């Protein structure tokens, strides 16, 4: 088996969460098991849009810096977006990872981190974008669905696709059961993709993402 490429230095990751942080934990576990150098990246900070979420607690248990940037603490959504961008930029990340971050970022954030902000979605984009991807796939009668790892742009789940994982839809599935199986695939795919982006580098050609 060929050895994994090793990045010249570990890429700096800022991870954004809104809830339980299971994708964050998957990243932390893989980096701990593999080693920062071999994985190619390290988490340098974790941010959230609300206090008291388990994702922040996971970060604190790992000894990582955390920050909270709440929408309601700012007069406008634009000012919140600028404040979030400033908070993230303070840690000088190479990549920003949305690990269940449920807020849509705006122009200021994308001006700084466009092409470097990685998100996951529980459907095979461009099918079933938006907040109810799992429910919509079931309602449509899709026989397969899955998850997408993509870069964030100024649309809703419209950014360039990096990788996808397929999950079969079973006849007995309800939204919860299907979503749990998607999340299992999503966690593994996100960990794999972030590591490859960090170790190998990448380029974006229109809508196509090429990992070197």
Regions from the language model: what does each represent?
Residues 2-54:
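N-terminal Rossmann-like dinucleotide-binding module
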Residues 2-14, 35, 68, 184-212:
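An anion-binding loop in the catalytic cleft
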Residues 39-79, 83:
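Short, surface-exposed acidic-centric catalytic microdomains
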Residues 44, 94, 115:
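Conserved acidic residues
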Residues 48-50, 72-73, 77, 91-107:
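N-terminal glycine-rich "phosphate-gripper" loop used for MgATP/nucleotide binding
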Residues 82-91:
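Short, well-structured alpha-helical segments in soluble
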Residues 99-208:
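Donor/substrate-binding cores of folate-linked one-carbon enzymes
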């Amino acid at each position: 088996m060929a050895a994994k490429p090793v990045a010249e230095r570990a890429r700096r990751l800022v991870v954004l969460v809104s809830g339980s942080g299971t994708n964050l934990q998957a990243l932390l576990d893989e980096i701990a098991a593999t080693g920062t150098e071999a994985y190619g990246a390290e988490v340098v900070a974790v941010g959230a849009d609300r206090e008291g979420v388990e994702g922040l607690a996971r970060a604190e248990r790992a000894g990582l810096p955390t920050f909270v940037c709440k929408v309601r603490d700012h007069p406008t959504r634009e000012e919140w977006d600028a404040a979030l961008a400033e908070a993230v930029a303070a840690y000088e990340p190479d990549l920003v990872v949305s690990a269940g971050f449920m807020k849509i970022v705006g122009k200021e954030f994308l001006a700084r981190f466009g092409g470097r902000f990685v998100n996951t979605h529980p459907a095979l984009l461009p099918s079933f974008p938006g907040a109810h991807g799992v429910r919509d796939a079931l309602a449509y009668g899709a026989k397969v669905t899955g998850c997408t790892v993509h870069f964030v742009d100024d649309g809703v789940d419209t950014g360039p696709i990096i990788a996808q994982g397929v999950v079969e839809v079973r006849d007995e599935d309800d939204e919860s059961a299907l979503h749990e199986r998607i999340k299992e695939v999503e966690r593994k795919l996100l960990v794999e993709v972030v590591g490859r982006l960090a170790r190998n580098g990448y380029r974006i050609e229109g809508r196509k993402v090429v990992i070197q």
